[in-house]
Amino acid sequence: GFEAQPSALLEKTDIIASTPHALVDLVNTFSPEENQEAAGQSVISLMQTQLQREANQGWELKCLPRPWKDVRDAETDEPKSFESVTKVPFPTVTVPNPVLNGARPLFPEVYLSVYANQEVDTVPSTTDISSSLIRDALVDTINLLDFNRVATAKFLIDIACYFPTTTFVKRATPFDRMRELAGEVQPWKPEDVAVDAVFSQLFQLPASEHKLVYYHSVLTECCKIAPAAIAPSLGRAIRFLYNSLETMDLELSNRFLDWFAHHLSNFGFTWKWSEWYVENASFHML
């Protein structure tokens, strides 16, 4: 089958993917001397590891939908054979020549997850190819729909509709409930995956794809559309980022401060300030 071809390619790309990029420290989310699981991992090296793992598992690619395996009649909902379904020709895709790369390809891309160090996995592990496949689909949509933040937010809220039913738990499932579901095959929290994708773009170095206020507004719209689902997920992300400020890149610390102030201004500055009171008590005497 086709399995031999990607395996041969992976052998050739291993030396490139395993070599650290000369500029990786310039775009690292956290200080390179700190052992931070959430960042500092090159997307290229991650994908190399993920693809090798997937090859060993027979290319299951569990997160990819397979609609042709469950074809049903629109009126009777009865199963239909795939051969009887009306085929639609795929349009020709024209790739511009030459492709304008711009400035971004000069720097490597690192994978950031604000949910990487939790006691329970609510987002795909970085060793799982699903983390790259789902993140890629979400990031592409976020950056391509920059002209309509509301449509972007609605898409992020409904991401479970675009993947197999076993991929995600029901929206707004409590975090404590995730502990009970922990096992060999555990579905992920769709709102965590969505928030993770937005933060990966908001904290992209050296610069984000769009103006930072766009990503601010997407998170705000998500909270307005599904507050019961997004608010708890966003709260855990905020706590992680706050606790990581000492090791975070200074530019990203400023971005976090700007976003947090902007976000709270839309919701009456409501936050559990008592959580941080003890840590910052020394500043109250100034």
Can you annotate each of these PLM segments?
Residues 1-286:
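Eukaryotic alpha-helical solenoid repeat scaffolds
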